[in-house]
């Protein structure tokens, strides 16, 4: 007989984190379900392996349908948040849709669930490839994960992991952009992804094309589980479980086997990547919680100099392609405090990208005289961000700010073989202090027929006089939604957005050692 599993979870008030007692929780499009107990917890037993959604509802709250998730070889714990409703009591119908409408983003938000990640044709369980299939996202080379949304470039996207900003989500990433051939984030960690292609929340700054907000699962509260996975390009495991009564964890490690496949089919380069990810969540009490998470990758691309097929094409590739070594990580912590209907959040994180390219003439490493390229670069970011939500009748105020310090270094040794051989010794060091403020006011009418969101964001840094005034990078935004009748809405949004150029541009020096783009009065 097929083994059955349980879906467990808790239903909480989105405003204050308090459990919602006696809420209805059912499996979407079925009559199978239950009611939460006095502390908001629920359990649905006898669930066969497969993909499901949950529907939760209670008097005085907006009905909610979760993103799709999978039951395979373990019980699932699923937290659900309900938002208070100001609408008069009446019969309601719940419609599941991948498009989630919010006051801040009534048009540009799409929620990506597990099934879409798993089943997307050619997606290979990689979120970037899933997004590439969406309208408004340009197609790129089959071996690249670059996101070009609404005509923008791959450097114009921002990524957040449970509120912690991460600089890139791909192995062998392009420095100064976000592309790469393979994703770093383990899809088994993901609960859902909010993909904003327009009308970004004011709390998510420094983006021109899109924002991807990843929401991760929590570890199992009751028992330990271990899962092994063999993917199209890697092998790995994921472990999760409790670490005491108030703490859960999950951790995964993956390593590629592409280097063996590439060697077998006779390709001139052998890429190897390893990534690790973890999340630890501790609930002090109903009012306070702390999540600590990390994401890291080690990438190494060697040259297959011992291959048998030394065709002219392969010789050409081996002659110009460098050895690539890249390391990247992000460590972050998110603390949340619930006070009445208000939520206070503090996020701290540190990220680093270490990038090395090395090339020897004829790939002969026996002598340093053969060294033609030695590129070494580091990007380090330290971030502190505060986000606060204050709720009033028919009105919500989101305010916060951020403070960041980043460093960028580049050491390049290169021999150029032209008419007269010459050596380039280039180095640059850049330190950058960044700060920003934001505020958003959200109004909902009594019957929720009309919603309005007015937000403003301002960012600045100490790079140059053109960038150090918050008012010069003032970013207002307005979103409106009006229900004409039934489920027919009239929606609209408008905004002005800014993005800081990449560190490779800001830190570029001329032959005299001056920051060239600072002298050119570069702005956001």
Give residue spans per PLM region.
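Face-selective signature of the C-terminal outer-membrane beta-barrel domain
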Residues: 281-299, 321-467
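Flexible, surface-exposed loop regions and adjacent strand-edge segments
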Residues: 111-113, 178, 267-272, 306-317, ...
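Outer-membrane beta-barrel signature, preferentially recognizing the C-terminal barrel domain
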Residues: 311-335, 377, 428-430, 489, ...
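Predominantly transmembrane beta-strands of Gram-negative outer membrane beta-barrel pores used
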Residues: 158, 192-203, 209-217, 224-268, ...
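Outer-envelope beta-barrel architecture signal
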Residues: 155-157, 189, 222-226, 245-249, ...
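Hydrophobic, lipid-facing positions within transmembrane beta-strands of outer-membrane proteins
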Residues: 145, 208-210, 224, 230-237, ...
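Periplasm-facing N-terminal accessory domains of Gram-negative outer-membrane beta-barrel systems
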Residues: 1-91, 95
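Periplasmic N-terminal accessory/gating domains of Gram-negative outer-membrane beta-barrel systems
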Residues: 62, 68-70, 78, 95, ...
